[in-house]
Amino acid sequence: MHIQFPSKPTLPRACWEGRITAGSPGMPPDEIEIEPVRQSSDKMLYCEAESPPTVEKVKPARENSETDLEIEDDEKFFTTGQKELYLEACKLMGVVPVSYFIRNMEESYVNLNHHGLGPRGTKAIAIALVSNMAVTKLELEDNCIMEEGVLSLVEMLQENYYLQEMNISNNHLGLEGARIISDFFERNSSSIWSLELSGNDFKEDSAALLCQALSTNYQIKKLDLSHNQFSDVGGEHLGQMLAINVGLTSLDLSWNNFHTRGAVALCNGLRGNVTLTKLDLSMNGFGNEVALALGEVLRLNRCLVYLDIGGNDIGNEGASKISKGLESNESLRVLKLFLNPINMDGAILLILAIKRNPKSRMEELDISNVLVSEQFMKTLDGVYAVHPQLDVVFKAVQGLSPKKTIFLLTNPMKLIQSYADQHKITIVDFFKSLNPTGTMKMSVDEFQKVMIEQNKVPLNQYQVREVIKKLDEKTGMVNFSFLNTMKP
């Protein structure tokens, strides 16, 4: 049987001119379209490489069924075509091909961070990706791609509906880059749902453009705008966008310059947002004045699960305002307050607010720069009794003797393993013996109770909590089934 391979890879019309091309995405494979020859343009993603000669490959006769070998041959040809296309694009752009990209262009994840591509190297990559159906996540951080490179990427995205995640952080995009990105996402549908734009010199005008696009485009789910220069006006634009956007689920705004006005405006938009579950506002330094607005967000918002407000100059006064929101919040699970000037008094306000809320779902409170006392630990025991799923991370306990400190910090799994070894049983057998039903699962509440009451391996509250963290399925249950392979 003779198999005649096509003379060139079948590509979307953005790459080959004046040829019969594959239909647009969504067009049946047997439909084709004919385009007239266009004039060459350095601003378009065209690769005018001559088509390679027709290759005829003879294969031995086989049974009337496809085999893995036939499929592999087809895939090999597809890969060869992609490689040739990229090499021709590099020749056209006058750049040296990236060997890593050639080796990995048929993988789902391609990491080209810190490769020094520049605008023309980025364009060569974009040309190769126009027809690529394998790459779903592309990393291009720190390549100095600038606005010319961004233009090549968005032209590629008009044809490529397979790429889903893209990182173009730290590329000096500035206002013009923000304009190109915003225009594309405002006017075009795309498969991109995760976009990282950290450290691109975006200022207030850039915020206005990006927020205008995000006010109508709900395809983006995860957005990183950290390490930019948004301030009060940028905060107002972001707040207005968040009030109407129903797509974003994760937003990183850390390391910007939000002051009181901008941060409060941002919080106002968050109050009624119904999709955002993760928000990072750390390292903005907006102070206690914004804490009241944050407390209102926690009181009214029913969607936010993760909130990082570390490094924002929030003291005990701000902690008091935030605690008001924690008293009624039913969705938040993680609250990070690390690197804020909160002392033990502020920390007590926070944990008591959680205790007073029977519907709290809090799992982690990060106050890891706060020194606490033994009295705080006793108060915390009462909170843990109500909310056993909670983990409060603090710096250390003041005034403990070295012996007591060692007792508190001894790895509980090693103690249990030692007991199991002495009695010639497995660690799973130890836990099953504590379960009245003898099964591999218990509720967190019941497990905590029996671990405190058992006298085989004496453990304190904090060691029991460490055991729970290792076994917790995050469903309110602990599971012993994987302990045979767990290291102490």
Swiss-Prot record:
Keywords associated with the record: Leucine-rich repeat, Repeat
Name of the protein described by the UniProt record: Leucine-rich repeat-containing protein 74A
Coiled coil: none
Biological classification of the source: Eukaryota, Metazoa, Chordata, Craniata, Vertebrata
InterPro entries linked to this entry: Leu-rich_rpt, LRR-containing, LRR_dom_sf
Mapped LRR repeat ranges: 134-155, 162-182, 191-212, 219-239, 247-268, 275-296, 303-324, 331-351
Gene3D superfamilies associated with the record: Ribonuclease Inhibitor (3.80.10.10)
